[in-house]
């Protein structure tokens, strides 16, 4: 009888003890672990590694503000060394500015030649003699008139350009003899058809200057009053300058195609002659 009672008590103790442990394991143990986690010091987060290109560009910026051959080489080295730098857009803009300035310097661009104007010369005649382009000679010499003076020194540019439009960045990049020349930000971009997707090859089909419905030749007295644009084909894409404000101050809407600031369009109109290849991607 006593043995039976002891056995029952032992079974009851076993059941109650197991239940107590189960409650502890299910509730109190988790609570204790939560408390430990809450009071434990946070796991230290490693500091991000500083981008060395930022410091390198900051050090180079004073030199990059100058338009010298040495400064240009330093910027080229930076771009080659840090092709993924967050400062790459700034460096590319500086390089483009330098290239444009130094292109008009025969010491910096020895491929360009100098021509001394002779009696009976005209821009058209000089362009024919030097196998150049009238508008490119006018542009590179920053002329304000087609009238020339005997003995006047004219720079004859060495240009063999191509262009790449990058949709995602909304930029038009010009290359000369296969090397980066300058990157131009696009003000407005509207592309359709094949030009709007994938990699699309086209070329300059025409460079147009019109006054009303009449086409005007370069050098004509009313050429400055014309509306100019560049036509690309295939793709029926056009390049335009941004519209100027109307007399009442309102700004007309941008035309479809590729729209650049007026200053940038003036460069592009001269740099991209008929037949120049353009890649859109």
Task: Describe the predicted segments one by one.
Residues 80-110, 133-166:
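Extracellular LysM carbohydrate-binding repeats and other cell-envelope/extracellular binding modules
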Residues 1-15:
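N-terminal Sec-pathway targeting helices
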Residues 120, 151-154, 275:
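Loop/turn positions that initiate beta-strands
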Residues 45-69, 74, 102-131:
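Primarily a LysM-type cell-wall glycan-binding module
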Residues 158-246:
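Gly/Pro-biased beta-strand-loop elements
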Residues 39-42, 78, 82:
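Alpha-helical solenoid scaffolds that mediate protein-protein interactions
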Residues 17-35:
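Hydrophobic single-pass membrane-insertion segments
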Residues 215-219, 250-271:
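Short beta-strand-centered segments at strand-helix junctions
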């Amino acid at each position: 009888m006593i043995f039976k009672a002891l056995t029952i008590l032992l079974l009851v103790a076993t059941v109650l003890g197991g239940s107590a442990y189960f409650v502890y394991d299910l509730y109190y143990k988790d609570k204790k672990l939560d408390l430990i986690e809450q009071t434990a010091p946070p796991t230290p987060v490693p500091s991000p590694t500083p981008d060395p290109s930022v410091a390198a560009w900051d050090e180079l910026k004073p030199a990059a503000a100058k338009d010298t051959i040495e400064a240009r080489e330093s910027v080229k080295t930076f771009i080659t060394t840090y092709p993924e730098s967050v400062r790459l857009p700034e460096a590319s803009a500086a390089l483009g500015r330098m290239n444009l300035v130094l292109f008009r310097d025969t010491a910096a661009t020895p491929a360009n030649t100098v021509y001394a104007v002779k009696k009976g010369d005209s821009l058209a005649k000089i362009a024919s003699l030097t196998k150049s382009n009238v508008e490119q000679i006018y542009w590179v010499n920053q002329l304000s008139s087609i009238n020339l003076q005997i003995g006047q020194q004219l720079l004859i540019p060495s240009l063999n350009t191509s262009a790449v439009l990058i949709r995602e960045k909304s930029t038009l990049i010009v290359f000369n003899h296969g090397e980066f020349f300058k990157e131009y930000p696009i003000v407005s971009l509207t592309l359709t058809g094949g030009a709007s997707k994938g990699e699309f090859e086209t070329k300059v089909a025409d460079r147009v200057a019109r006054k009303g419905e009449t086409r005007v030749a370069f050098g004509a007295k009313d050429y400055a009053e014309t509306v100019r644009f560049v036509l690309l084909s295939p793709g029926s894409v056009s390049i335009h300058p941004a519209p100027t404000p109307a007399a009442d101050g309102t700004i007309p809407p941008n035309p479809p195609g590729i729209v650049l600031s007026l200053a940038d369009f003036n460069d592009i109109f001269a740099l991209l002659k008929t037949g120049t290849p353009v890649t859109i991607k």
